[in-house]
Regions:
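Conserved class I S-adenosyl-L-methionine
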Residues: 1-55, 154-176
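Class I SAM-dependent methyltransferase SAM/SAH-binding core
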Residues: 61, 67-114
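A short acidic, Gly/Pro-enriched loop at the edge of an enzyme's catalytic core
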Residues: 113-124
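A short SAM/SAH-binding and catalytic strip from SAM-dependent methyltransferases
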Residues: 124-137
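A short glycine-rich, Lys/Arg-flanked "PGG" loop and its adjoining helix->strand segment in the class I
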Residues: 138-149
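Short alpha-helix
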Residues: 180-197
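A C-terminal cap/extension of S-adenosyl-L-methionine-dependent methyltransferases
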Residues: 205-256
Length: 256
């Protein structure tokens, strides 16, 4: 585990550079992304966000943009997109993805705790599984710094507490960086110290079983996720304490 921020950043950069270049890992991530992390209008995680937002003409940041897949989606919705990532290789992929589509998105290599953007630049900040890799207090301050007054940030993040997911994490330590830590509700609430007000949606209690549905094809797997997540939402309403056993969250942070 890192003892300094510089060590942490090195761990993160080296891990994600290596992961992206491993064909098997890429296939595993792609299957999981299509089934569980569906970012389209019909996805249970991001679908409600797209219904609530009109991104046309908005200036947005893809925080921890990776290879740019989510950035492309944001640009397709009419946003002026900027992205940052610690990995030079992934940023090169993101730039290529934008160039192929003539999107005009801009990408920068660097530390997410200290981005190159001026204060109050962005209407919205988006991130997918990035916060739990960072020093949260610094990350929250940076997100608040670059957001316009009244701006919002949306992050999809893993939670700690799902028994099956925790077992998988324990059994496969090499699939994660040594410094990452899934979020808990205290970590989410700690954003208030940076002037951000959080609102959290929890997902995937029973829906983790949808991975088995992938054996019948991705379409069946995605349909299984929607069905099981609908059940999960009913369970969360009936017994709110079950939210502590959810696998994933989508967190909306509003700048005060």
């Amino acid at each position: 585990m890192a003892t300094t921020l510089a060590e942490r950043l090195t761990h993160e950069r080296d891990f994600h550079d290596r992961l992206e270049r491993e064909p098997l890992s890429y296939q595993m991530v792609r299957i999981a992304s299509e089934i569980f992390y569906n970012k389209d209008d019909d996805g249970v995680l991001w679908g409600p966000v797209w219904k609530a937002l009109d991104l046309r003409g908005k200036v947005v940041l893809d925080y921890g943009c990776g290879s740019g897949g989510f950035s492309v989606r944001l640009a397709a919705r009419g946003a002026r997109v900027y992205g940052n990532d610690i990995s030079e290789y992934l940023v090169s992929q993101a730039r290529a993805a934008s160039a192929r589509r003539n999107l005009g998105a801009e990408f920068y290599v660097g530390d997410a705790h200290h981005t190159p953007f001026p204060p109050a630049m962005f209407d919205y900040v988006f991130g997918n599984g990035i916060l739990h890799h960072l020093e949260l207090d610094r990350a929250y301050r940076e997100v608040a710094r670059v957001l316009k007054p009244g701006g919002k940030a949306f992050f999809m993040e893993p939670l700690i507490g799902h028994p099956l997911v925790e077992a998988v994490r324990w059994a496969t330590p090499g699939r994660r960086t040594v410094d990452e830590k899934p979020m808990d509700f205290a970590a989410i609430e700690s954003s208030r110290a940076a002037g951000l007000v959080p609102a959290c949606r929890t997902h995937y209690l029973t829906a983790v079983a949808a991975l088995a549905g992938a054996a019948f094809g991705r379409s069946f797997g995605k349909a299984s996720v929607r069905t099981l997540d609908a059940l999960d939402q009913k369970l969360f309403r009936m017994a709110p304490s079950l939210k502590k056993k959810a696998w994933l969250s989508v967190i909306e942070y509003s700048k005060t």
